[in-house]
């Protein structure tokens, strides 16, 4: 569908505008909530209703928009467009920290490191990677909101970080049960299908000993929350290998343009924490990201030819 749009810049500008509006309204809601309640906002699940777009997806959209803005800033000869792009980049980075989307922040760090490695010599890249890692770690440890989101610092009962993950991160149980299903069903060739995969997951949720947690998992009807695991279970190892070959070709082709590469890396990392093909929105995200990544490569090639 997106490939039929002749001027892909309209897709880029439309996406950036939509993400800006959603994040701006969400930011206002967050600020109002914080000013009225004086509570630690980002760590509370009750604030999800303040997000116009679900936090996980909003964070990903912000990362994608930032990458596209970096491409505009680098390629544009219009000073006004450059300044506007830079201002929006700063705004989106601020919003990333405000909404405290863990996956988006980690993807953003990986994108930044990829850009460093792509453009610098190995020694300089190594030093900058170490520096960025130390700075990011310091921010996580010292910022109360981020420390709560990443390190579960508000939990003073459980002694170890692993125990905190087991308690507070639903993906721990989801991925554990998915692994059990893989061992039991042995979907080595053609898989067991999406319906049976979900059915078996729900049956596993009934085994959770804590009643409140068990009911929450069953009520939410969690899928695998990992696209790669879902493909392996639903379509077998053969299906996963075919998908990974497709992924390999995408990454290989996008090496021609750092921003295209970063778009694809962001998408592939996002698939680790979200099963996007179970949502219509997710399928649109997958298609749109690939179309825009391809467009960035083509536009760069056309620019080189014109030069």
Give the positions of each predicted feature.
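Active-site-proximal inter-transmembrane loops
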Residues: 37-52, 213-226
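A membrane-periplasm/extracellular boundary helix in multi-pass inner-membrane enzymes
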Residues: 119-162, 176, 180-185, 194
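Transmembrane signal-anchor hairpin modules in multi-pass inner-membrane enzymes, especially those
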Residues: 3-9, 13, 72-83, 123-126, ...
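Alpha-helical transmembrane segments of multi-pass inner-membrane proteins
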Residues: 7-40, 51-120, 141, 249, ...
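Long extracytoplasmic/lumenal interhelical loops at the membrane interface
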Residues: 162-176, 188-235
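Transmembrane alpha-helices of multi-pass inner-membrane enzymes
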Residues: 112, 262-272, 276-307
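Membrane-interface micro-motifs in multi-pass membrane enzymes
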Residues: 49-64, 102-103, 224-227, 232-236, ...
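Hydrophobic transmembrane alpha-helices and their immediate junctions
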Residues: 122-126, 233-267
């Amino acid at each position: 569908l997106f490939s039929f749009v002749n001027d892909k810049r309209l897709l880029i500008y439309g996406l950036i505008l939509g993400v800006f509006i959603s994040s701006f309204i969400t930011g206002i809601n967050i600020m109002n909530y914080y000013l009225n309640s004086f509570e630690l906002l980002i760590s509370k699940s009750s604030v999800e209703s303040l997000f116009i777009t679900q936090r996980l997806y909003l964070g990903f959209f912000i990362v994608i928009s930032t990458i596209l803005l970096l491409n505009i800033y680098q390629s544009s000869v219009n000073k006004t467009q450059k300044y506007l792009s830079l201002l929006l980049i700063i705004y989106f980075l601020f919003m990333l920290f405000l909404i405290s989307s863990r996956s988006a922040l980690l993807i953003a760090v990986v994108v930044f490191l990829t850009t460093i490695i792509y453009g610098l010599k190995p020694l300089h890249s190594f030093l900058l990677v170490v520096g960025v890692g130390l700075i990011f770690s310091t921010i996580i440890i010292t910022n109360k909101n981020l420390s709560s989101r990443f390190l579960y610092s508000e939990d003073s009962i459980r002694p170890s970080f692993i125990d905190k993950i087991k308690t507070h991160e639903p993906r721990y149980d989801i991925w554990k049960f998915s692994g059990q299903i893989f061992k039991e069903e042995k979907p080595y060739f053609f898989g067991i299908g999406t319906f049976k995969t979900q059915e078996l997951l729900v049956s596993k949720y009934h085994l959770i000993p804590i009643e409140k947690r068990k009911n929450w998992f069953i009520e939410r009807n969690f899928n695998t929350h990992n696209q790669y695991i879902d493909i392996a279970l639903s379509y077998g190892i053969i299906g996963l290998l075919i998908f990974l070959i497709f992924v390999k070709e995408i990454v290989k082709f996008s090496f021609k343009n750092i921003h295209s590469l970063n778009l694809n890396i962001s998408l592939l990392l996002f698939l680790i924490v979200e099963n996007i093909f179970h949502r219509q929105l997710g399928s649109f995200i997958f298609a749109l990201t690939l179309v825009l990544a391809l467009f960035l490569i083509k536009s760069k090639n056309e620019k080189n030819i014109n030069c």
